Amino acid sequence: MSLQHIVLFSFPTDLDAAGEAEMRRQVARWPGEIGGMTAVRLGRSINDERTRGHQFLLYTEFPDVPALVAYQQHPVHQEFLRWVLERQCTPLAFDYPLDETTVVL
């Protein structure tokens, strides 16, 4: 069963250009160094009025739960998590299956 892992990031102060570039650099490492994911996207919100303070969204897909767990435990992901938390970011994560029960269109 494939699944989607989404994380919203809320930093107390907006990242400057260097901070955003570093965040993107770290995420760009994942496919080659962690593996196991079938899709990775990282984007900044284009509408701050509706985000409740979340500036970025991370979108990933995995073929199964063991691949998600391996990603979460991988040292490269742990390094990214430390980087995010050191900036007093409040991440909000949501995981759900990509199957016939979640298809709308």
Task: Name each region found by the language model.
Residues 29-31, 76-81, 88:
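A common structural junction motif
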Residues 85-90, 101-105:
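A general structural signal for short secondary-structure boundary/capping elements
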Residues 1-54, 63-73, 96-105:
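Short S/T/G/P-rich N-terminal loop/turn motif that feeds into the first structured element of a domain
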